[in-house]
């Protein structure tokens, strides 16, 4: 379980995928044979558009350990359900897992959830680069305004950037 959770947590951060896309990944989406690839492309369920993401060394190691431990095949769901009613981990069960992680480190589960994991790396990339277009592509948003709202960029932030930009 710890191996799966580490793989799930790391991939959630790296991929920036929505819960509905993350839980439906198959081994073949992120690996060739037993080798996890450094990049992957997934068709988003919500937008029906492809989104590409990198998979860090740390995440690849966690995923390879999980795939090996769970004896997953190429066509298997990466995070299979333990229930017979479903083939893959449900978004609800994923939310419960995230809530348990959050609670285990004494954070308020009302403040953090599955979307926090999606937003984490995107926010860090934006803070470091201020490149909205890059973050838009990484999140698979169709509109730049969606990315602005998503990151919580306020007028104050925009003015601050403008003041610190030399022409």
PLM-predicted stretches and their roles:
Residues 1-167:
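Conserved catalytic core of the tyrosine transesterase superfamily
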């Amino acid at each position: 379980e710890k191996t799966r959770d580490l793989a799930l947590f790391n991939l959630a951060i790296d991929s920036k995928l929505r819960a509905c896309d993350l839980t439906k990944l198959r081994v073949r989406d992120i690996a060739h044979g037993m080798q996890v690839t450094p990049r992957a492309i997934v068709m988003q369920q919500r937008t029906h558009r492809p989104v590409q993401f990198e998979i860090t060394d740390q995440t690849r190691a966690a995923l390879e350990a999980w795939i090996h431990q769970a004896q997953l095949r190429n066509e298997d769901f990466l995070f299979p359900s333990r229930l017979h009613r479903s083939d893959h981990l449900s978004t609800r069960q994923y939310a419960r897992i995230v809530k348990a992680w959050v609670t285990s480190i004494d954070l308020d589960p009302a403040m953090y959830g599955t979307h926090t994991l999606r937003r984490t790396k995107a926010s860090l990339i934006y803070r470091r680069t201020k490149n909205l277009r890059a973050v838009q592509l990484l999140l698979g948003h169709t509109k730049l305004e969606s990315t602005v709202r998503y990151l919580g960029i306020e007028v104050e932030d925009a003015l601050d950037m403008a003041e610190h930009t030399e022409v």
